[in-house]
Amino acid sequence: MAGRRAMRPSGSSMRGVVARLAAARSPAVSFLVAAAAGAALVGGVYFWLVVSSFRLPDSRAVGCLPDGEGSWAIGMYYGKSPLELRPIELEGRSNGNSSAWPVANPVLTCATPTEGGYPSNFVADPFLYVQGDTLFLFFETKTVSTMQGDIGVARSLDQGATWEFLGIALDEAWHLSYPFVFKYENEIYMMPEGNKKKELRLYRATKFPLEWTLEKVLIDKPLIDSSLVQYDGLWWLFASDFTRHGIEKNAELEIWYSNSPLGPWSEHKQNPIYRSDKSLGARNGGRLFIFEGSLYRPGQDCSGTYGRKVKLYKIEKLTKEEYKEVPVNLGIEEAKKGRNAWNGMRYHHIDAQQLASGGWVAVMDGDRVPSGDSTRRSLFGYMGFLVAVALVTFVGFVKGAISCYIPPSFWVPLTRRSELSRILPVHRFNLKIRRYSTSIGRNISATKARLSEKTWSNTLFFCVIALIGIVNVCIAVHFLLGGNGAEEAYTHQGQHSQFTMVTMTYEARLWNLKLFVEHYSRCESVREIVVVWNKGNHPTSDAFDSTVPVRIRVEEINSLNNRFRGDPLIKTRAVLELDDDIMMTCSDVEKGFKVWREHPERMVGFYPRMIDGDPLQYRNERYARGKKGYNLILTGAAFMDSEFAFSKYWSQEAKEGRDYVHKNFNCEDLLMNFLYANASSSRTVEYVHPAWAIDTSKLSSVAISRDTQKHYDIRTKCLAKFASIYGPLPQKWLFGMREDGWDK
C-alpha cells in the first residue's frame, strides 16, 4: 500500500499544478484566439486578392480532380508540312453551336470522357486513326474509379474542330497508355503500353473502334511507349526498357526490327541506343513519320520534370547494325502564358499524319502544371501552416501568454521499493534529462528576459517574426486553397475559344498601357491586343512585354468613335473593349467571356448602371445596387460581337449619335447601349461581378471622368439626346439571376 501511495502525486503538488494551469489558461486562450483571428484576416484578404482569381476545384465534381500526374489535355494542329504546324485557333475553324469563333485548343479535356459517363482526371498520349474524312482519336484517360489509365476513343467529322466521345476502347486490370493504332493487311491493330504486365501486347479490332481482342504478345519485356514504323523494307519498333541494369529512367531508347509487325522481333546491335541524360529525348514522344523521304522520331525531353517538351529527331541512318539521329526544329511555337496556357508547363506527345488532301494534321497533349504538382502544393501549404503555428507559439511563449510547466515530480522515480533503482540506467537517464531540461529552462528564461526589454532591436525582431508569419499564412492559403494556381479559361458546350482585346489610349498614358498589356496578355483566351492610338507619337509593338501579338492602330482623328471602328484584321468575333485604366483578374475576364459565349447577342460587362427617372439621369453603380438591378453596361469593360456591334455603330442610323459623341468627347458607351436596345426586343445586356477591379482613371490627369460631377452632367445630357433619337432603354434586369452567382 505504501508503494502504491507513493505512485500518486501529493495533494499539494496537484493543487500547485492546477493553480498554475488556471492562471495561464485565460491569457493563453486570449492570445491564441487573437492570433487565429489575425491569421484568418490575413488569409482572407490574400484569398480575396489572389486566390479567388484561380480556377478552384469543384467539390461536387466527379471528374477532373487534382491529380499528381497532372491535368493533361489534347490539342489539334494543322499545316502543309509536319514541320510547320499551327494550332487550330490560328486556322480559323469555327463552331457556331458553341459560339466558338474560332475554336481554340485544347479540343479534348478530362471533361470529355467525364461528361460521357466515364469520369476522368486527364487525357493524354493521343493517337489518330484516319478513315476517309473521319478522324478517330485514341488516348489514355485516367479513370477516377480505378485511378489507372484506360484507352478512350473519340470521333470527329469535321477534321478535328469538334469531337464526340464514343467510349472506352480498352480496359484491363492494369494501367494502359500510349495506344499506338495502325493498319496492317486490312486489319486494325492497337499496341498500347501496359508495362505493369511486363510484356508488350498487340490487340486487333473485332468491331472498330470499341471492341478489341488480344492478338498476341509481341515481346516478353516491359517496354514503354512503343512505336512502330515501316521503313526501308523492314518494320522497326522503338521503345524504352527501364528495367535494364544501369539505366537512368526516361533516358533509355532501344530498337527492334522484323519483317512483319506481328514479329518475331530481333534486337538492334547498338541497344540501348541511349542509356542516360533525360534531356536527350530518348523516350518516345509519339508516332514516327516520313516526310519527303526522311524518317523523323519525336522524343520526350524529361529534364526538370517528366514530359517537359517534345524534341524532334531526323534519323540519318537506320540499319540492323547502325543508328544515327540529329535534332531538328519541331516547328511548333511554345506557349508563353505559363500555367494560364493549357500546355504552358509541358507537352510530351505528338502524332502527325498526312491527309488525303496532302495537308497534315496532328494531335498533341499538354499540361499547365509539372509532374507531382498537387502533391508538392499540399506539402508547401502544410509546411507554411506549421511554420505559422510554430511562430505564434514562440511569440506567445516569449511574451508570457503561453507557459509550459513541468512539475519536478515528473522526473522522480515512481517507486521507493528499492534503493537499487538509483543505480539503474533508467534513473541515470532521468537525472540526465532533468539536468538538460533545467539548463534549457535557464536559457529560455534568459531569452525571455532579454526579449521583454523595450528596445528597438526587440521591436524589429518581433516585426520580422510577424512578417514571416504573415508570409507563411499566405503560403498556406495559396497552396492549400489555390487549386493549381492557374486562371483557366472556361468552356462552353465543351469547347474553348478566343477573343481580341481592344483598348483606346494616348501618348500621355503609355506607362499605364504597358502594365495593361503585360497583365492581360497572360489571360488564356486573349488572342491579340489592339491598341487604338488616338493622339501623340505612337510606340512600336515591341515596346510591350506581351505574350500575344500587340497591334497599334493609329487613328487620324482624335475621337471616341474610333473605339468601335470596324477592323478587318481582327480574327475573332468576340471583342473585349477595355479601358486601359481598369485592372481585374484574368479569371474574371474569362468568366465574362464564357457568359458572352452563352449569349453572343448581348453585351456582357463588368460595370452596370441603372438609367431611369424623368428626365433620365446618369448615376453610379451604387444607385443600381440600391435599385437591385440594371439596364445598361458600360463598354469600358464589356464583351460584344464585333461584327454586329461595329457595323451597327457605324451605320447611317447612328450618324447623329456619333456626331454628338465626337462633339462632346463622351458617351460612346451610352450610344452603343441605345443601338443594341433599339435593334432587339430581347435582353441586350448582362452583368458579371468581378472579384475585384482597380480603376486608375482618378489618378490620371487626362481621364475624361476625373471630374466626376462634370462627367455625370455631360452623360445625363447624352441620355436625353439618345433617347429622343433611338427610343428608351430596356427595363431593369435584376442582380443575382444566374445560378452560378457570377452576377451578384
From Swiss-Prot:
Mn(2+) binds at residue 581. This is Glucosamine inositolphosphorylceramide transferase 1. It comes from the Eukaryota. It is an enzyme of class 2 (transferase). Keywords: Disulfide bond, Manganese, Membrane, Metal-binding, Transferase, Transmembrane, Transmembrane helix. Disulfide bonds join 667-718. Pathway: Sphingolipid metabolism. Highly expressed in almost all tissues. Disruption phenotype: Loss of the GlcN(Ac) glycosylinositol phosphorylceramides (GIPCs) is seedling lethal. Stunted plants when regenerated from callus. Coiled coil: none annotated. The gene is GINT1. The active site is at residue 669. The chain crosses the membrane at residues 31-51, 378-398, 460-480.
